[in-house]
Amino acid sequence: MVKLFNDVATQTRQVFENIKIALEMSDLNFNDVAKLTFFLTDISQMAIVRDIRDQYIDTNNPPASSAVEVRKLINDNLLIEIEAIAVAN
C-alpha cells in the first residue's frame, strides 16, 4: 500500500517524480512536455505547486499549463493530480 502524505508539497513532489519516471521510460524528459494540467482540491495552494514545478521544468520555456480546483479526487487523501502531455520528436 502506498502511503499518502497530507500536504500538497509532498504530494506534488511525488507526482513530478512519477511523471519523470514515466517520461524516462519513453526516453523523454520535461523539455518534451507540451502541457500540464493541475487538479487541486484547494487552488490557494497553487503557489506551492508552482515552486515545485519550477524545479522540474525550464522556466524560460515552460509548457502550457492549466489549473482547475476540484471538490475531490479519486482518492479522498489526494490533494493534487497532474496530467502531463509530452510530444516525442
Language-model features: where?
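Short, polar/acidic, helix-capping and beta-turn segments at strand->helix junctions
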Residues: 1-89
